Amino acid sequence: GVERGLEFHSLSKSFNMTGWRLGWVCGSAEWIARLARVKSFVDTGPYLALQHAGAAVLDAAEPYLERNVAHLEARRDAAVAAFRAVGFDLRPPRAALYLWLRIPTGEAAREFALRVLEEQAVVLLPGSALGEGGEGYVRAALTLPADRYEEAASRVARAL
């Protein structure tokens, strides 16, 4: 491992810092030096204050992660219950921030997602946008407060 590869990590999802472009990389000193050289030609890194914020988050990571996981699990459980209540058969994700909903009408994923957006003002990603295996599914992001999923699921169901 460490002699032949690099391992990348991000603060984006675990610490709700999407868009900050903060993370770290693990590997041998030789490979880290090579990466630093390439990075020096590409960009100068995130704003220093953001880097300090990221370091502060890592210093207090454990209690924050426990609260964040509980929050995300509640959001996931609310979304799964809401979509199941309107007839979707789905498995709860173990770690992802998304639900995969099989389109029961057989409609193409892109057309269904566009129709739900236009008719019900709910944004779903067509599974086909992520590859052939995604056709027949839409992806719902678990980014809403837990109390909003019942309404979102009802709107999607009205589009069926």
Where does each model-flagged region fall?
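PLP-dependent class I/II
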Residues: 1-160
